[in-house]
């Protein structure tokens, strides 16, 4: 059985203020894959991730999540399909691992962001799946 493609890019170029910093990025992620993005400080790792997460506008090309172009996907729908936790935004001494995992449920909560028992069960299930 062919694995479902979750995310791919097509001719993606990223940068700031219309200036291309990294060109023709090719990414293809399938269900169940674990991928790392490795490089020295300033190489553009965060710029690539922020562009994929729709926090930065792509300079050229497209990003697709489940074969839907991100430019056509509302932010709330994207948040249900993808989350990225940047380490500089976390204050780990004030958060448990469960707190960080629970951040992925917030797009499914109401305006107050309060987790329901169902949300808490999903968090527990996710933690069990990755054995933490």
What is each stretch, according to the model?
Residues 61-69, 78:
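Conserved ABC transporter NBD signature motif
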Residues 53:
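Helix-to-loop junction immediately C-terminal to a conserved catalytic motif
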Residues 38-40:
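The feature captures the beta-strand-to-loop junction immediately N-terminal to the Walker
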Residues 117-132:
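Conserved ABC ATPase "signature" region
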Residues 19-20, 76:
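Short coil-to-beta microelement around the adenine-binding A-loop and adjacent beta1/P-loop entry
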Residues 7, 22-24:
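Conserved structural motif at the start of ABC-family nucleotide-binding domains
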Residues 72, 88-102, 107-114:
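Conserved catalytic motifs of ABC-family nucleotide-binding domains
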